[in-house]
């Protein structure tokens, strides 16, 4: 659990640098870009699936009876939300840029720590990969004669072949487990070192009289306040855009309810 928390903290603090710890061939992508891409995909999926649900409802017996015409207003609603997203895009981009700028120093320090630990750990990872490949090749060599025997033998030899393969599989499992345990033993000190470095960085922030933490908090609060103020016009546009849709829905619903009530009274 501690290792998982440490990993998440490092990924957050180092931003795109931590991502390239393992993936050097991909172009850098800022945290805001990743959040924006995820939000865009989510909204698009929600929009498409929502339209399908509305279409299914209007095609049902109840939907036809109520005749709310939700599908007619769906494009208007999605267009309004798309407009809101476009208006808020630059505002939220500015907020994220400011936040990244304020934490640049801390992220650079953590990135440096991560690179140093990576350099120390890399030989053990390379050695583990080499041994793993050797074990796989050894296993393949041991299994190859049995595979040939299976091709040449009859069905009655299948059980005999399975008995021969079982010890090989157990041996492979035990040897792999030994390599994993050895790798875990080698990496443990460096995991502790990285955790201690992170703790030291955070402790240093506290020991500075809390000045840097207070500064981060104050600037984040300021940026959030600015974001809220700049978002007000866009949210007001959203409210104005939804009013006709809500009013149309209200009229259709009341009309359907009145018609249904009349039918009940005539029965």
From Swiss-Prot:
The keyword Transport applies. Changing residue 127 to N: In Munster-3A. The keyword Cytoplasm does not apply. Residues 68-267 are annotated as: 10 X approximate tandem repeats. Changing residue 27 to H: In Munster-3C. Glycosylated. Major protein of plasma HDL, also found in chylomicrons. Synthesized in the liver and small intestine. The oxidized form at Met-110 and Met-136 is increased in individuals with increased risk for coronary artery disease, such as in carrier of the eNOSa/b genotype and exposure to cigarette smoking. It is also present in increased levels in aortic lesions relative to native ApoA-I and increased levels are seen with increasing severity of disease. Sequence repeats lie at residues 68-89, 90-111, 112-122, 123-144, 145-166, 167-188, 189-210, 211-232, 233-243, 244-267. Pfam families: Apolipoprotein. Residues 1-18 form the signal peptide. Changing residue 92 to I: Confirmed at protein level. Changing residue 180 to E: In Oita; 60% of normal apoA-I and normal HDL cholesterol levels; rapidly cleared from plasma. GO terms for biological process: acylglycerol homeostasis; adrenal gland development; amyloid-beta formation; blood vessel endothelial cell migration; cellular response to lipoprotein particle stimulus; cholesterol biosynthetic process; cholesterol efflux; cholesterol homeostasis. It is found in: Secreted. Participates in the reverse transport of cholesterol from tissues to the liver for excretion by promoting cholesterol efflux from tissues and by acting as a cofactor for the lecithin cholesterol acyltransferase (LCAT). As part of the SPAP complex, activates spermatozoa motility. Belongs to the apolipoprotein A1/A4/E family. It is linked to Hypoalphalipoproteinemia, primary, 2: An autosomal recessive disorder of lipoprotein metabolism, biochemically characterized by severe apoA-I deficiency and severely reduced serum high-density lipoprotein cholesterol (HDL-C). Affected individuals have undetectable serum levels of apoA-I, and develop xanthomas and corneal opacities. The disease is generally associated with atherosclerosis and markedly increased cardiovascular risk. This is Apolipoprotein A-I.
């Amino acid at each position: 659990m501690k290792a998982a928390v440490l990993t998440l903290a490092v990924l957050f603090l180092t931003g795109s640098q931590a991502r390239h710890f393992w993936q050097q061939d991909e172009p850098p992508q800022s945290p805001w870009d990743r959040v924006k891409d995820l939000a865009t995909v989510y909204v698009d999926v929600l929009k498409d699936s929502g339209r399908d649900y509305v279409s299914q409802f209007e095609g049902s017996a109840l939907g036809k009876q109520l005749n709310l015409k939700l599908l007619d207003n769906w494009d208007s609603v999605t267009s309004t939300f798309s407009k809101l997203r476009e208006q808020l895009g630059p505002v939220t981009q500015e907020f994220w840029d400011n936040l990244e700028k304020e934490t640049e120093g801390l992220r650079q320090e953590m990135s440096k720590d991560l690179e140093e630990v990576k350099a120390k750990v890399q030989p053990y990872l390379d050695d583990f990969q080499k041994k793993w490949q050797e074990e796989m090749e050894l296993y393949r060599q041991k299994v190859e004669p049995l595979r040939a025997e299976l091709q040449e033998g009859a069905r009655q030899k299948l059980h005999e072949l399975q008995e021969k393969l079982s010890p090989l599989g157990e041996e492979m499992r035990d040897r792999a487990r030994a390599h994993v345990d050895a790798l875990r033993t080698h990496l443990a000190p460096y995991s502790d070192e990285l955790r201690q470095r992170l703790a030291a960085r955070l402790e240093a922030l506290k020991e500075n009289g809390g000045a840097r933490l207070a500064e981060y908090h104050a600037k984040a609060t300021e940026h959030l306040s600015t974001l809220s103020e700049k978002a007000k016009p866009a949210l007001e546009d959203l409210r104005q855009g939804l009013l006709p849709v809500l009013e149309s829905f209200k009229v259709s619903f009341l009309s359907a309810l009145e018609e249904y009530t009349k039918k009940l009274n005539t029965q």
